[in-house]
Amino acid sequence: MSKSKSLAFVIAALSYSFFSLFSSPPKSHYHELFISTSFSDNASVALNLHTLTRRPHVAGTVANAEAAEYVRSVFTSSALKSHVVAYQVSLTYPVHRSLVLTPTDSAKPITFLLEQEKLGDNPYANEVMPTFHGYAKSGNVSGPVVYANYGRVEDFVRLKKDMGVNVSGAVVIARYGQIYRGDIVKNAYEAGAVGVVIYTDKRDYGGDEWFPASKWMPPSGVQVGTVYNGLGDPTTPGWASVDGCERLSDEAVELSGDVPLIPSLPVSAADAEVILKTVVGDVSDGDVYPVGPGPGVLNLSYIGETVIAKIENVIGVIEGEEEPDRYVILGNHRDAWTFGAVDPNSGTAVLMEIAQRLDKLQKRGWKPRRTIILCNWDAEEYGLIGSTEWVEENREMLSSRAVAYLNVDCAVSGPGFHASATPQLDELIKVAAQEVRDPDNATQTIYESWIGSSDSVVIRRLGGGGSDYASFVQHVGVPGVDMSFGRGYPVYHSMYDDFTWMEKFGDPMFQRHVAMASVLGLVALRLADEEIIPFNYTSYALELKKSAEDLENEKLGHNIDVSTLIKSIEDLSTAAKHISLEKEAIKGALKVRELNDRLMMAERALTDRDGLSERPWYKHLIYGPSKYDDYGSKSFPGVDDAIDNAKKLNTKASWENVQHQIWRVSRAIRHASLVLKGELI
């Protein structure tokens, strides 16, 4: 070998060694670090949650603005480019509340205090806002009491048809636990009631002992919340509530059908028990209370104040190195009806933990391929307002650039992992859950405990309108995820949802918070870092097939044909399989980019610009809320609405509309197949 060749060989060898020594590790190395115990910090999570829940922080208040500044400071100290996006939105607050019961004509009236008992030593308990319903109608009404169980449509049908009870002119009392409170008020109004009282029944929320001795709701506990049936600022439907924007009048808002037309109040189990003792009559099957009417008479008086209030979304950004114009978005809301230890600030603490771990990764040299955006929303409790206004303002950018939205709301309320998602994310969630230890059983992964709880992994869908994923999934068509440990908790939306409850019952060691940050953050990292976006549309096709089979099994008659729907799903399955083969053979940055665009945009194809009939804001034809329960999730919501209407009217036109809605869904699925294939017809 010549000297020149020997020298060249030595230089090449040294160069390779130098490159191997100082080149960045693979992305998977950073992902392993992210979920390692060395990166997690239980004490930091606890400190952040304690700070956030020190005072009640309803949207539009000084306390919530202070909480926003705290979140922003943590984002900034975690090397996120942070800023606040403010909106001016219409919110309501209570001015006057009164509830008076006259048991019989000769009995002395009983005036309820409408207060939650102050338990424990919380120094800020006096700052808790009086119990009320957001956007409740002001008014003074009186009527005999009628008990309507959970206030569902079927409960009112049973009262009228099976029990002969006339609700017209009555004040309805119904219990929480099955449907969204705004739908309870709406159903009562449509049945003829003049007012509504909603309470937390001991059968659903109580126990032999209660907080602070146990996790259960005290007898004086009251679940507050909004009764608004829309999303976003009621005065700016479809556009953002920026300074100087167009706004609907109060009259136009009422005509929209999204705000209640009769007054309502939330009450405690203790107050409800007094009211229900004055009701006589038949008892509905499976229940314990007579339905009335009366003889007890309720006088309900409520005056609310509507104000244009400033709300603040806190946004933190880590710009992508290779694809800065592709966004992986994580979000949680900050505002709470009271202290908000579970709802929502367990999620806020998780989001902050993720921010702090991402900072540690950046200090080790990690940079995301795609941009990661952390969003802390405001005014969610009033009607998903902060997230909806932001989505409406950024609709076009999100439609063309958002990869996925990962939501965490009530992140921790107890044991047991739960996930909801659009189906192309199912496999990614399962894989992430296989890599994180179960916080309640260190011998198993979250996935092993999850599958062991029901012999299979159950991933629910994001059709309901219960949290901030709604605008992303149901309005724009961005793939989405929502996760939690625990599902439902007794002191929901009461003054007892505080740090003490979390520390004693929800997550004493804050290990569930840490685990949630690991799973959610790992899903985000994979979406942000993997060369090809890890979406699996075969899962989507299988899920749609199940929904189509359920529809077919209804045997609707009236010449309803679902064959076009089934064919479109078969086409989607074929396209998904083709994508899998394409991934294995693809080469070149432009080809990868084009494939990722197809994976990202296929979900958008499942939306329709005209939206659902009578609910045009909801654009997604596959997943949307039930018409009669905003919390309830429906597959093919437009078809479901049409079937319900046809069963009521039983006219040729109404059944033809069912077929039309099936055609609409079929076309949307076919469009998604074409997007996945990258074909022009």
UniProtKB/Swiss-Prot annotation:
Its cofactor is Zn(2+). Binds 2 Zn(2+) ions per subunit. This is Probable glutamate carboxypeptidase LAMP1. The gene is LAMP1. Glycans are attached at residues 42, 140, 166, 299, 441, 536. Its main location: endoplasmic reticulum. GO terms for molecular function: metal ion binding; metallocarboxypeptidase activity. Pfam families: PA (PF02225), Peptidase_M28 (PF04389), TFR_dimer (PF04253). Residues 241-527 are annotated as: Catalytic. Keywords: Developmental protein, Endoplasmic reticulum, Glycoprotein, Growth regulation, Hydrolase, Membrane, Metal-binding, Metalloprotease, Protease, Signal-anchor, Transmembrane, Transmembrane helix, Zinc. It comes from the Eukaryota. The chain crosses the membrane at residues 7-24. Disulfide bonds: none annotated. One of its GO terms (cellular component) is vacuole. The keyword Ion transport does not apply. It catalyses: Release of an unsubstituted, C-terminal glutamyl residue, typically from Ac-Asp-Glu or folylpoly-gamma-glutamates. Zn(2+) 2 binds at residues 343, 381, 493. It is a single-pass type II membrane protein.
